[in-house]
């Protein structure tokens, strides 16, 4: 299930006693082919937040929300950093940023939007639900 996958992905980055992550996951099953690239994307986002973003300071946090739009048949992932130092557009794109922007989304014919707001990084990914949802046989 997605909630457990997200909790497992962020666990190595959590500091005991601090509420660094708020997760609002959709209870869906992600297929194994989609789970690894999603976790790799989250790993890169966490690494960047620890090095440059909200998780560099004690009061910083990351909100992770997902939702399914049944009508459009899409899965939406949103990462929002808050309470960290002001951020700006990076002067160059690292391999990690390339992975975030192109890895998960492009593998499943989706799209990624990265915004470097003064209040923190926001990453939104949309992919077709059918490409990532595990199908349970009846």
Set out the residue ranges of the language-model regions:
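C-terminal end segment of the histidine kinase catalytic
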Residues: 127-138
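ATP phosphate-binding glycine-rich loop and adjacent ATP-lid/helix-beta elements
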Residues: 87-113
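Short beta-strand element(s) in the Bergerat
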Residues: 19, 73-77, 121
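Short beta-to-alpha transition helix within the HATPase_c
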Residues: 1-12, 65-67
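Glycine-rich nucleotide-binding loop
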Residues: 85, 117-124
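Short beta-strand patches within cytosolic ATPase/nucleotide-binding catalytic cores
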Residues: 22, 63-65, 113-115, 124
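Short beta-strand/loop element within the Bergerat-fold HATPase_c
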Residues: 59-72, 80-81
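Conserved short strand/loop->alpha-helix "switch" segment adjacent to the catalytic nucleotide/phosphoryl-transfer site
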Residues: 14-60, 91
């Amino acid at each position: 299930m997605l909630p457990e996958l997200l909790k497992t992905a962020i666990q190595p980055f959590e500091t005991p006693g601090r509420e660094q992550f708020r997760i609002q996951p959709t209870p869906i099953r992600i297929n194994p082919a989609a789970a690894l690239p999603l976790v790799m994307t989250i790993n890169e986002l966490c690494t960047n937040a620890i090095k440059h973003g909200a998780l560099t300071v004690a009061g910083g946090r990351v909100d992770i929300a997902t939702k399914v739009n049944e009508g459009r048949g899409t899965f939406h992932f949103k990462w929002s950093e808050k309470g960290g130092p002001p951020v700006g557009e990076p002067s160059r794109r690292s391999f990690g940023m390339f992975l975030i922007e192109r890895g998960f989304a492009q593998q499943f014919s989706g799209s990624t939007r990265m915004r470097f707001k003064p209040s923190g990084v926001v990453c939104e990914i949309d992919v077709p639900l059918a490409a990532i949802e595990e199908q349970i046989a009846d």
